[in-house]
């Protein structure tokens, strides 16, 4: 699974005022190197791309806040890409596999391992930079030599867990190390709700079989939204409802919520929209400076930790728009009223407690060409449909965010293995297999991993050399 780490830095370049083709380095001014890449276009002329290089990497095509930056990225480092994973099939224990994984050059990933002796392990795979003088969260100059990368984390220093007391391992794109780990891995990990829910389900299982783990992957419990449900409960007291009777349906909506994000779940749509509205309004004063520099700026980190802290403390100094609202209570009432009105208008409802989650949460899978050729979208895209799950559910499914694969397989029990994939096995829109797997993936129906009897054969024949000349 994805580490959600930070393996790219934008190095702010200091240009020589007397020669803009030179940039500052710890060794003084250095000239950019220039190279041309040729992009072959099928059926058309080759395209030439001019690239300026620095000692840290290529200069980005777009400036950052008006200034040039270089891309220092592990993926562009020859040392970070190799075929080391081919040795994994020689591993005979988790210790062998750990040695292979931690030394392989590949996109950084979470690696979970198990062996025939019952040992299990987790680690990171891929090259992760060792930073000096910076944590990678902002763009800075490396010209003075006090900041930059000093290399990659040595394989033996990569974090790992072997045979944990719980007897299982969980990886859900969340942070896997604590503050004692000396190296920066990232800044924008997924929050821990999905990982916590997976742990809860595994802890409760006495025996683990394939249907149990498929059911786990289809779990739609969303504990993240409980905070916002309780916030509405505290806000809408009988006294407040007497003054704002139009909000009674909001109280009824959250009381009707079953704690899940199923298609027919009531209340979770209101909680989702309320959370989104609160985040936009509460963070607006803090992000104003960012948006003055870049109107398209979007805060894309773990918003719930700071948001919940601000909503819990309700300090007068952090009240959004104090000229308009006397206190946090007035602000929260306004946000809830606006959220209810917006949902009713957007979905044509007379009551917000009638809004089912599937009306709001719809899965959209579009082919890249459908945006450029809209008329063919109906043949290229998967049908838009109501979907269970959410961004914080184990069954992650919200808009364009969804599980790209579900699989449950146990060695020596391949006949019981389960596999899900969206779309189909063919990439050809006219093939009967273009979308033949989508229904089972969408509805969570058990689908065998093993192919079974062949029903279709596809033969690849190399093009004759004469045809290529």
Predicted segments — roles?
Residues 1-469:
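C-terminal/peripheral segments of proteins
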